[in-house]
Amino acid sequence: MATPKAKVSKSRRDKRRAQFTARSKAAVTTICPNCGEPTLSHRACRHCGQYRGRVVTKKSANG
Protein backbone atom coordinates (compact mmCIF):
# COMPACT_ATOMS: atom_id res chain seq x y z
CA MET A 1 0.00 0.00 0.00
CA ALA A 2 1.24 3.50 -0.78
CA THR A 3 2.32 5.74 2.07
CA PRO A 4 1.97 9.52 2.14
CA LYS A 5 5.13 11.58 1.66
CA ALA A 6 3.97 14.29 4.04
CA LYS A 7 1.20 14.88 6.54
CA VAL A 8 -1.92 16.46 5.10
CA SER A 9 -3.09 19.24 7.39
CA LYS A 10 -6.66 19.33 8.66
CA SER A 11 -7.26 22.50 6.69
CA ARG A 12 -6.07 20.99 3.41
CA ARG A 13 -8.01 17.78 4.05
CA ASP A 14 -11.21 19.69 4.81
CA LYS A 15 -10.84 21.92 1.74
CA ARG A 16 -10.56 18.84 -0.43
CA ARG A 17 -13.64 17.26 1.13
CA ALA A 18 -15.64 20.47 0.79
CA GLN A 19 -15.34 20.31 -3.00
CA PHE A 20 -17.62 17.28 -3.10
CA THR A 21 -20.58 19.22 -1.70
CA ALA A 22 -19.65 22.47 -3.46
CA ARG A 23 -20.31 21.02 -6.91
CA SER A 24 -23.88 21.56 -7.97
CA LYS A 25 -25.81 18.50 -8.94
CA ALA A 26 -28.02 19.91 -11.65
CA ALA A 27 -31.24 18.02 -12.27
CA VAL A 28 -31.32 16.39 -15.69
CA THR A 29 -34.63 17.07 -17.36
CA THR A 30 -36.22 15.79 -20.53
CA ILE A 31 -39.42 16.65 -22.37
CA CYS A 32 -42.33 14.29 -21.77
CA PRO A 33 -43.38 12.83 -25.14
CA ASN A 34 -47.02 12.62 -24.01
CA CYS A 35 -47.73 16.12 -22.65
CA GLY A 36 -44.60 18.09 -23.58
CA GLU A 37 -43.81 19.23 -20.04
CA PRO A 38 -40.24 19.10 -18.69
CA THR A 39 -39.76 16.11 -16.42
CA LEU A 40 -36.89 14.54 -14.47
CA SER A 41 -35.07 11.78 -16.33
CA HIS A 42 -35.94 8.20 -15.33
CA ARG A 43 -39.00 9.40 -13.39
CA ALA A 44 -42.72 9.43 -14.12
CA CYS A 45 -44.08 12.71 -15.46
CA ARG A 46 -45.63 14.79 -12.69
CA HIS A 47 -48.21 16.28 -15.06
CA CYS A 48 -49.61 13.28 -16.91
CA GLY A 49 -48.33 10.39 -14.77
CA GLN A 50 -46.74 8.45 -17.63
CA TYR A 51 -43.34 6.79 -17.81
CA ARG A 52 -42.07 5.11 -20.98
CA GLY A 53 -45.51 5.14 -22.56
CA ARG A 54 -47.37 3.62 -19.59
CA VAL A 55 -49.58 5.29 -17.00
CA VAL A 56 -47.87 4.61 -13.69
CA THR A 57 -49.57 7.21 -11.47
CA LYS A 58 -53.20 8.19 -11.68
CA LYS A 59 -53.86 11.91 -11.57
CA SER A 60 -56.93 13.02 -9.60
CA ALA A 61 -59.46 15.52 -10.95
CA ASN A 62 -58.32 18.13 -8.40
CA GLY A 63 -54.72 18.03 -9.57
UniProtKB/Swiss-Prot annotation:
<dbReference type="GO" id="GO:0003735">
    <property type="term" value="F:structural constituent of ribosome"/>
</dbReference>
<dbReference type="InterPro" id="IPR044957">
    <property type="entry name" value="Ribosomal_bL32_bact"/>
</dbReference>
<feature type="compositionally biased region" description="Basic residues">
    <location>
        <begin position="7"/>
        <end position="18"/>
    </location>
</feature>
<dbReference type="GO" id="GO:0006412">
    <property type="term" value="P:translation"/>
</dbReference>
<dbReference type="InterPro" id="IPR002677">
    <property type="entry name" value="Ribosomal_bL32"/>
</dbReference>
<dbReference type="GO" id="GO:0015934">
    <property type="term" value="C:large ribosomal subunit"/>
</dbReference>
<comment type="similarity">
    <text>Belongs to the bacterial ribosomal protein bL32 family.</text>
</comment>
<feature type="region of interest" description="Disordered">
    <location>
        <begin position="1"/>
        <end position="23"/>
    </location>
</feature>
<dbReference type="InterPro" id="IPR011332">
    <property type="entry name" value="Ribosomal_zn-bd"/>
</dbReference>
<keyword id="KW-0689">Ribosomal protein</keyword>
<dbReference type="Pfam" id="PF01783">
    <property type="entry name" value="Ribosomal_L32p"/>
</dbReference>
<keyword id="KW-0687">Ribonucleoprotein</keyword>
<protein>
    <recommendedName>
        <fullName>Large ribosomal subunit protein bL32</fullName>
    </recommendedName>
</protein>
